[in-house]
Amino acid sequence: MSTNNMSDPRRPNKVLRYKPPPSECNPALDDPTPDYMNLLGMIFSMCGLMLKLKWCAWVAVYCSFISFANSRSSEDTKQMMSSFMLSISAVVMSYLQNPQPMTPPW
């Protein structure tokens, strides 16, 4: 057994324990895409509700899906779910007020 320890090239006094870097110095962990999409979803939801534009309501649903897909599991989901429900309600209300199919905005 002592021969095995003598042939081991590792030096136990040089072993350093791994410490993860703080999140403030790692810009890759601070992805602002979910926050931007959440804000855009709320803006488009309000435009869809107030201006009765169906395409704005659908863009809000799309932005909410992107925000949900890009978020981290450690984030609080209350704001994201409220944005998602606001966008769904914008679509529902715009089709309740005018049930005709959506006309393209161009």
UniProtKB/Swiss-Prot annotation:
Keyword Hydrolase: no
Quaternary context: Component of the PAT complex, composed of WDR83OS/Asterix and CCDC47. The PAT complex is part of the multi-pass translocon (MPT) complex, composed of three subcomplexes, the GEL complex (composed of RAB5IF/OPTI and TMCO1), the BOS complex (composed of NCLN/Nicalin, NOMO and TMEM147) and the PAT complex (composed of WDR83OS/Asterix and CCDC47). The MPT complex associates with the SEC61 complex.
Membrane topology reported for the UniProt record: Multi-pass membrane protein
Phylogenetic placement of the source organism: Eukaryota, Metazoa, Chordata, Craniata, Vertebrata
Main location: endoplasmic reticulum
Molecular function GO labels: protein folding chaperone
Protein known as: PAT complex subunit Asterix
Family: Belongs to the Asterix family.
Entry function: Component of the multi-pass translocon (MPT) complex that mediates insertion of multi-pass membrane proteins into the lipid bilayer of membranes. The MPT complex takes over after the SEC61 complex: following membrane insertion of the first few transmembrane segments of proteins by the SEC61 complex, the MPT complex occludes the lateral gate of the SEC61 complex to promote insertion of subsequent transmembrane regions.
Gene giving rise to this polypeptide: WDR83OS
Modified residues (N-acetylserine): 2
Lumenal compartment spans: 52, 96-106
GO cellular component: endoplasmic reticulum membrane; multi-pass translocon complex; protein folding chaperone complex
One Pfam family this sequence matches: ASTER
Disease the record associates with this protein: Neurodevelopmental disorder with variable familial hypercholanemia: An autosomal recessive disorder characterized by global developmental delay, motor and speech delay, impaired intellectual development, intractable itching, and signs of liver dysfunction including increased serum bile acids, hepatomegaly, elevated liver enzymes, and gallstones.
Keyword set, alphabetical order: Acetylation, Chaperone, Disease variant, Endoplasmic reticulum, Intellectual disability, Membrane, Transmembrane, Transmembrane helix
One BP term from GO: multi-pass transmembrane protein insertion into ER membrane
Residue intervals on the Cytoplasmic side: 2-32, 71-74
Organism (species): Homo sapiens (Human)
Segments of this protein annotated with the region Disordered: 1-29
TM segment ranges: 33-51, 53-70, 75-95
